[in-house]
């Protein structure tokens, strides 16, 4: 598919950890982690996408959200090329008990299980784990490159 896909992702923080799901690229043989969210539907605001996707996939309600930034993500997954414009939000989960759960299990639209877990930002910063989309870690820790003017 040669189209740019707009998506919205939300970062949920729990001390030094963030809520992510684990993915696996069979072609690269690579395990990676990504924040939760999904495709923005026509006529839908990005923050509403975050709320809808989290309810659909994990059956969890999202409270307050705050816009963090936008990333452009050009990548390959399982041998296919993709191009996304990613609107990133910081958010809070309404059910505070979810911050104590090690794993939150849900279902993707295709029926596959989705397992969200809390991972330390240090694991990504030290290169022990891979966080996608590229640039998300820098956005979260405030290390985006700035132009010298």
PLM features: residue spans?
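A short coil-to-beta-strand element that immediately follows conserved catalytic motifs
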Residues: 61-69
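A generic structural micro-feature
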Residues: 2, 32, 79-85, 108-113
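Conserved Nudix-box catalytic region and its N-terminal flanking loop in Nudix hydrolases
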Residues: 17-56
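Conserved N-terminal beta-strand and adjoining loop/helix that marks the start
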Residues: 1-19, 39, 90
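Active-site-adjacent beta-strand/loop module that shapes the phosphate/pyrophosphate-binding cleft
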Residues: 75-102, 117, 136
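NUDIX/MutT-family hydrolases
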Residues: 100-138
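Internal catalytic or translocation cores that form aromatic/hydrophobic pockets or channels
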Residues: 51, 72-73
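Short connector loops at helix/strand junctions that flank enzyme active sites
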Residues: 5, 13, 35, 62, ...
